[in-house]
Design a protein with these regions (language model features):
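N-terminal functional module of multi-domain proteins
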Residues: 2-3, 11-122
Length: 123
């Protein structure tokens, strides 16, 4: 089993922007976590498929935390018996992010575009 962990606060190069489509009942938000993801992922031997999953979890956590008014932390977590045993991303009310992951050796052989079902061994 392999394990890696990292934490960071929201750096200045990251961005979160809300938008409204005029004339339509559509509003949303977009997030860019370039610097934060570099800090979280850098220096850790995450398999490519796990890098993608952690990036998606971090974006989801940041978007959800930005729309909720709360004190505390929001956690996005995956736990499985598959190639990825555990992937956790935590986002606090100030949008600080941290992440950790544990994976089995076979996760390194997965393609970078492996689906979530493949990561959890649900095929």
């Amino acid at each position: 089993m392999n394990t890696a962990a990292a934490s960071t606060s929201t750096p200045s190069r990251d961005a979160l922007a809300r938008f409204v489509l005029e004339g339509a009942a559509v509003r949303g938000a977009v997030v860019s976590l370039d610097a934060t993801l570099r800090d979280i992922l850098g220096g850790h031997p995450y398999p490519p498929a796990l890098v993608r999953a952690l990036a998606e979890f971090a974006a989801a956590a940041a978007l959800l935390a930005s729309t909720l008014k709360f004190k505390g932390s929001l956690v996005v977590q995956l736990a499985s018996e598959g190639p990825v045993r555990l992937a956790v991303v935590e986002c606090d009310a100030s949008l600080g992010l941290r992440a950790t992951a544990q994976w089995r050796d076979e996760a390194g052989a997965l393609p970078a575009d492996a689906t979530l079902a493949v990561l959890v061994g649900d095929l």
